[in-house]
Amino acid sequence: MESFDVVFPLNFGLPAALPANRAIAEAALRASRTQNIPVFYAPLGIFELGDYPPRICADFNGYISTVKQVRALVETARQRAWRRVLIIAAPPHRWRALRDVRAAGFEAEVDDSLRALPRGLWYARESEHRQTTSWFRWWFTWELPARLMIYACRQCYERRASR
């Protein structure tokens, strides 16, 4: 897929000032400028994009999960007739991000530009999302259990991630 309707960055931990989220935001801006398409993200404040004009935001309350972000994308995409999504996600998050966006009915690809960054960039002790504070916590307390849940019961995964 060469052309897309929207760039969809997904955070990796909180706050927006984490090195991981700054790298994701920069990649989203580059992709938006290169493709001449808008950036969509949710919730508000998850990324610092300055006053970059072709951006669209949605908001929701509570825990920030990939499932909630994809649901916000679905709602906005219906209004704007978006079908093709370029995902910007941290390499450890790529598989599930792509799976969740495709499961919502989109044609999607993940931008490869972030794969060249060092693995240590993605994990930060100061992250408000405990699972992104270390490689071990991400894989063994979060990502692998999430993948098992997806395979065992997709609806269970979505229900849990929607809280």
How would you label these PLM feature ranges?
Residues 1-135:
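A structural signal for short, hydrophobic/glycine-enriched beta-strand patches
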Residues 125-163:
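Glycine-rich flexible loop motifs, especially short His-Gly-Gly/GGXG/HXGH segments used as catalytic or interaction
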